[in-house]
Amino acid sequence: PDATTLLKFRHLLEENDFGKEMFARIGALLQANGVKVSGGTIVDATLIAAPPSTKNEDKARDPEMHQVKKGNQWHFGMKIHVGTDSKTGLVHSASITAANVHDSHEVPNLLHGDETRFYGDSAYRGKAQRERLKEIAPNAKDFTNKRAYRNAPLSDADKEANRRKSSIRAKVEHPFLILKRLWGFAKVRYRGLAKNANRAFAMLAAINILRHGRPLTGEVRPA
């Protein structure tokens, strides 16, 4: 197909929210064919950069993208939030927001509700978050990383517990590695959240097929 046909097809996907639908249907199909979702969910988010410059046709930044401070650096763009199964690594839930939305805000969109274990970094820890977790997944135990405070440093036991939790949480980084480093989605391709969200959901669906799709495709045998 030529470039015009491809562009029309992309617009069709965007207008009908097909990227999100594709992600949901492929996830359901994989689960129906043996890729089980366990009781553990790991949540995390990654930043996708957008151009901060106003040197463009509109002489303005994308109004749907926002900036956030991470460490000592400011980042402008959006976030991809995911809920990943702690055993299989299947991305079963996702949401897309501007970069300034706090990671913990999206937890209700990232859990399936039957969790018995909830993993996340220290950004997902806190009293309000624990109360929210009880409402969404009442049987889930909180395995988020413990945070140190100014007058309350972590004990050696706390540090060791955090290391064990982090080794489990590493599964959530694999989809981000494919998405950003292998497939080049470290920066937004379009203006606006909706277009980039459609691309993100479609790519997450493709990642699930890449990593877990053998039950659907079977073995490829030579003729």
Descriptions of predicted regions:
Residues 112, 116-117, 122-198:
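Helix-centered, glycine/charged polyanion-binding patches within enzymatic domains
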